[in-house]
């Protein structure tokens, strides 16, 4: 049953496939190259209540209907982007920043948090104006709605730009694992006849979905692993003192990870020492040493943290990845830890994140409550 739920979450309304009508069997990808053809359509593959595949074809080839397998049967529409660009690594200070991390495929939690903090309305429209929202990694895996979560962020990203706002999607270790084909949901099994129903080989659907040929896969590859907004550096795992010895800038970190994102350097290091480090156990995707002693290293000391702050010229570092009981600070307020256990239902008051408003930091939740850190 769990495998079926995961399968349905992967396939229910998000396998958007652009294909030329009448030319062979479409594959599990979203591509934009068909726009040069006069006869083209957007196909979406779904799984119904009987776990059978079916295909829907839309004449609006650039719009995808996303359905959510939750009790409310939520759905929304996403327009595919004309092009994908790589995000910058640094941004000037802005008056309003909201951050949340480690949603892990939990659509209800993300929905509640964004609604209650006026990032979007109930029709999934961006209403945060020129504010910035940071999604600090690990928005996939564990939960059963990873793809719906990704499509929602994808949608909000392009709407934010139109109002002068910005969505920052920072990669976490689970995004990398999925891109490498090693995510939590990679072993989903489905019957042979279900493959045949759609006439598509779904044997590696999870890997294909995050491949460089799919829309979401291409989109994730434009994302950074670390960004700085004003005085705040946002990174999913953390920053090890050892990173200073490589003397990398933010662009160097992001480009190196992006160039090596397909390779499991965590387990199989290669010649590029910087890439090995960045994608390895003490890199920004995986490092836990800002919060705790771990089996591979000790917890970062106060003096080591100060060196990290000085090197990156960043008084504040915001992280997820390592679980804490509540949004909290460390190192005399220089570190903000935001990986909490979010609620599974809508608006339970347990889904929490960070608000930075005119330089003042608040803990916020999915009921609209706020309190100073």
Set out the residue ranges of the language-model regions.
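Feature recognizes metal-dependent phosphohydrolase scaffolds
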Residues: 2-373
């Amino acid at each position: 049953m769990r495998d079926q739920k995961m399968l349905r979450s992967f396939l229910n309304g998000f396998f958007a496939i652009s294909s030329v009508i009448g030319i062979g069997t479409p594959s599990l990808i979203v591509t934009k190259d068909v726009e040069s053809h006069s006869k083209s359509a957007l196909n979406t593959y779904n799984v119904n209540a009987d776990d059978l595949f079916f295909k829907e074809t839309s004449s609006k080839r650039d719009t995808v209907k996303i359905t959510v397998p939750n009790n409310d049967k939520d759905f929304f529409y996403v327009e595919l982007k004309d092009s994908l660009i790589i995000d910058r690594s640094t941004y000037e200070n802005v008056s309003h920043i909201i951050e949340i991390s480690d949603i892990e495929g939990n659509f209800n939690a993300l929905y509640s948090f964004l609604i209650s903090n006026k990032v979007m309305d109930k029709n999934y429209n961006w209403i945060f104006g020129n504010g910035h929202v940071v999604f600090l990694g690990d928005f996939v895996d564990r939960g059963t709605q990873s793809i719906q979560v990704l499509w929602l962020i994808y949608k909000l990203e392009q709407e934010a730009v139109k109002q002068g706002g910005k969505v920052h999607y920072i990669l976490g270790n689970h995004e990398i694992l999925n891109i490498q084909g090693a995510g939590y949901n990679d072993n989903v099994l489905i019957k042979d006849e279900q493959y045949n129903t759609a006439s598509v080989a779904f044997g590696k659907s999870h890997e294909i979905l995050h491949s460089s040929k799919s829309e979401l896969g291409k989109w994730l590859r434009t994302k950074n692993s670390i960004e700085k907004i004003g005085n705040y550096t946002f990174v999913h795992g953390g920053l090890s003192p050892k990173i200073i010895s490589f003397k990398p800038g933010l662009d160097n970190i992001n480009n190196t990870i992006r160039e090596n994102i397909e390779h499991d350097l965590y387990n199989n290091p290669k010649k590029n020492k910087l890439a090995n480090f960045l994608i390895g156990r003490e890199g920004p995707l995986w490092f836990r040493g800002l919060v705790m002693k771990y089996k591979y290293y000790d917890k970062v000391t106060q003096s080591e943290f100060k060196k990290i702050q000085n090197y990156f010229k960043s008084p504040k570092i915001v992280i997820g990845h390592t679980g804490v009981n509540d949004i909290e600070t460390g190192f005399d307020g220089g570190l903000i830890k935001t990986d909490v256990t979010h609620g599974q239902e809508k608006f339970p008051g347990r889904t929490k994140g960070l608000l930075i408003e005119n330089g003042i930091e608040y803990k916020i939740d999915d009921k609209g409550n706020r309190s100073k850190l």
